[in-house]
A protein has these predicted regions:
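Short linear capping/connector segments at secondary-structure termini
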Residues: 28-32
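Helix-rich interaction surfaces within compact, conserved domain-sized segments
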Residues: 24-26
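Short beta-strand elements of extracellular/lumenal beta-sandwich folds
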Residues: 206-225
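Aromatic (Trp/Tyr) and acidic
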Residues: 1-21, 33-188
């Protein structure tokens, strides 16, 4: 319907070159930035809409299609590492990506001490149990700053809605540019620490007996399975 198509166009104009004298804000290195929580979510979801607009709704308007495609490509490339930090906001992608994503399951923490996971120092510093390959995190603030700490979850959180539009944009890229699967992906994971161990001590002892206190410790960070 022409009315909804026009609303679609107005939305994308606001996110690209501006509409009605207004335009989306940008980080210094060029990311279209709506607000702090999930800045990459908003940008990559709009990138998906831009791909749809370029390939379907406005395919007969060469100038608009080019503008929307360029916006979508640059936004996705920003997420992949084409930014002033030279860092990918997609976990496990590229030579440099964030290390402290806010995702409890992949952290493998068996207690509530997980604030230093992904850090190189601190009482609880250790790597995540699992690399959450392909997940998009929240993203930078308006200055382009990013804090790679689990506790700063406005930057590091992984959420379903953060990844929905991003995944759709990836599908649009594959449809548009093609691609192939990596036969060596994902790599085989090995436990990063001892998963199962015993702790025992003498609880009490007398001339005729010795009472042992023993604990079987399960620090596995894997899904339920037969051991």
């Amino acid at each position: 319907d022409s009315q909804w198509k026009e609303q679609f166009r107005k939305h994308l104009e606001y996110w690209t070159t501006g509409y009605g004298g207004k335009q989306i804000a940008h980080t210094p290195d060029g990311l279209a930035w709506l607000f702090q929580w999930g800045s990459m979510r908003h940008a990559t979801t709009t990138a998906f809409l831009a791909y749809v607009a370029a390939d379907e709704l406005f395919a007969d308007d060469a100038a608009a299609a080019t503008k929307y495609t360029d916006f979508a490509d640059s936004t996705m490339n920003y997420a992949f590492g084409d930014n002033d930090l030279d860092m990918s906001y997609v976990i496990g992608m590229g030579d440099k990506y964030l290390q402290a994503w806010h995702h409890r399951t992949s952290s493998g923490a068996w207690n509530d001490k997980w604030s230093n996971i992904g850090q190189t120092e601190g009482e609880d510093a250790k790597p995540h149990a699992h690399t959450l390959y392909g997940a998009l995190v929240g993203g930078p603030d308006q200055t382009g700053k990013y804090s790679d700490k689990i506790g700063d979850y406005q930057y590091t959180e992984v959420a379903i809605d953060y990844n929905a539009g991003y995944t759709a944009a990836l599908c649009a890229m594959v449809q548009k540019y093609g691609g192939s699967s990596d036969p060596d992906f994902p790599p085989t994971e090995t436990p990063k620490w001892t998963e199962f161990f015993m702790r025992a001590s003498i609880n009490q002892a007398a001339g005729s007996y010795t009472e042992i206190k023993a604990f079987a410790m399960n620090h596995s960070a894997w899904p339920a399975r037969v051991i």
